[in-house]
């Protein structure tokens, strides 16, 4: 069945590529957040353990939305660790132990990187590729990451 949504294949393909890069970033951030949930230590253990859980649960929802947006545009979502590792713009957290404060700082840096990428890619998606729907979707994701970044910054003050 052909897709007929007033977006040519030449408009949709680059947008699907943007979504798959974003999906790789979301997966990387999800895994890092989950890692920190498992490995946080210190006086704030209980609070941060729950905080990281809340964040990775939201990231799980966001990953699903990104993948489904790619499918809605008749594309395919990346689905392997190799694809995610090759496409992500974030750095993985290594197994080395880091302080709770460093965990928060790393997550904040990643959310801020995603926000910067989303801001640029939302504009590109709308202006260059004519996809107002995905532009709006990316702005919504940016707002979710801005809220998570704000919460991380609040812990670091």
Task: List the predicted regions and their residue ranges.
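Conserved alpha-helical segments that form or flank metal/cofactor-binding pockets of metalloenzymes
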Residues: 44-83
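Long, contiguous binding/interaction regions
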Residues: 2, 45, 57, 77-85, ...
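Short conserved catalytic/interaction loops centered on acidic-Pro-aromatic/His motifs
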Residues: 75, 131-135, 154
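Acidic/histidine-rich alpha-helical segments that form the ligand environment
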Residues: 68, 82-140
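Short amphipathic alpha-helical segments with heptad-repeat character
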Residues: 13-23, 27, 53-56, 60, ...
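Helix-loop segments that flank and shape redox-cofactor active sites
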Residues: 6-14, 29-54, 121-133
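A structural signal for well-ordered alpha-helices, especially hydrophobic packing surfaces
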Residues: 23, 30, 37, 56, ...
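Disorder-to-helix initiation segments
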Residues: 1-22, 96, 100, 104
């Amino acid at each position: 069945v052909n897709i007929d949504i007033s977006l040519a294949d030449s408009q949709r393909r680059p947008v699907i590529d943007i979504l798959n890069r974003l999906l790789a970033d979301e997966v990387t951030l999800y895994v890092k957040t989950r890692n920190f949930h498992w490995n946080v230590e210190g006086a704030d253990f209980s609070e941060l353990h729950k905080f990281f859980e809340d964040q990775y649960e939201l990231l799980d929802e966001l990953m699903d939305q990104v993948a489904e947006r790619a499918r809605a545009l008749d594309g395919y979502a990346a689905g392997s660790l190799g694809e995610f590792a090759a496409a992500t713009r974030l750095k993985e957290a290594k197994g080395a132990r880091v302080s709770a404060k460093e965990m928060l700082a790393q997550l904040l840096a990643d959310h801020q990187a995603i926000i910067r990428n989303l801001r640029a890619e939302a504009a590109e998606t709308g202006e260059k590729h004519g996809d107002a729907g995905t532009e709006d979707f990316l702005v919504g994701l940016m707002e979710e990451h801005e809220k998570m970044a704000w919460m991380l910054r609040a812990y670091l003050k």
